[in-house]
């Protein structure tokens, strides 16, 4: 469990499952994903998250805003080994009602710190579809840098059903860059 200035980043509980299923069934939240998730698929994702935590000691946190909401979504680190062996991404998915408060930026900044300082990662990446401007802004605000040479067609996106979601832009940050820039990056500077 980690406390940031406004957030509690914690392991998942069964009480999070209803809110997570609602988030995954929201077309606004899932606009840049391959459709909505059923309750069964949403619960299976939580199970995978918890299994990963048990095996590795890190993963996607449930995000709580104490005094405001017991669950607003997730932020954290997740393997992206379908791109390259050992590659880890920082990612987030928050309920639309909580967008625009800086929660994703605040929590993702902490995820980078944990990834570099506690897990010992050499690099953390993130990626999304080009049209996902909100997520791209978060990536840039936490210090990730766009690497056009890394842009790719996502191997897990169905190109027939979701051709507009195949192409992805790629961002990265090394541990050395993080240590050099960490003091100058502040989530409080940004409204997302």
Predicted regions and their residues:
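A general structural signal for short secondary-structure boundary/capping elements
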Residues: 53-58, 170
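Short glycine/serine/proline-enriched coil/turn segments at secondary-structure junctions
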Residues: 52-55, 82-84
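Conserved GNAT-fold acetyl-CoA-binding loop/helix
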Residues: 28-50, 58-59
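Acyl-donor (CoA/ACP) binding surface of acyl/acetyltransferases
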Residues: 1-32, 62-192
């Amino acid at each position: 469990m980690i406390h940031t200035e406004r957030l509690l980043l914690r392991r998942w509980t069964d009480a999070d499952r209803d809110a997570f299923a609602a988030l995954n069934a929201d077309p606004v939240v899932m606009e840049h994903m391959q459709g909505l998730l059923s309750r069964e698929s949403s619960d299976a994702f939580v199970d995978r998250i918890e299994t990963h935590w048990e095996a590795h000691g890190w993963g996607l946190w449930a995000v709580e805003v104490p005094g405001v909401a017991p669950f607003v979504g997730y932020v954290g680190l997740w393997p992206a080994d379908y791109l390259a062996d050992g590659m880890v991404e920082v990612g987030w998915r928050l309920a639309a009602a909580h967008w625009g408060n800086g929660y994703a930026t605040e929590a993702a900044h902490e995820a980078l710190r944990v990834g570099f300082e506690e897990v010992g990662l050499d690099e953390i990446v993130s990626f999304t579809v080009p049209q996902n401007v909100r997520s791209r802004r978060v990536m840039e605000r936490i210090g990730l840098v766009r690497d056009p040479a890394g842009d790719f067609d996502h191997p897990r996106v169905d190109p027939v059903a979701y051709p507009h979601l195949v192409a992805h832009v790629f961002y990265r940050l090394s541990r050395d860059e993080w240590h050099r820039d960490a003091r100058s990056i502040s989530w409080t500077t940004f409204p997302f």
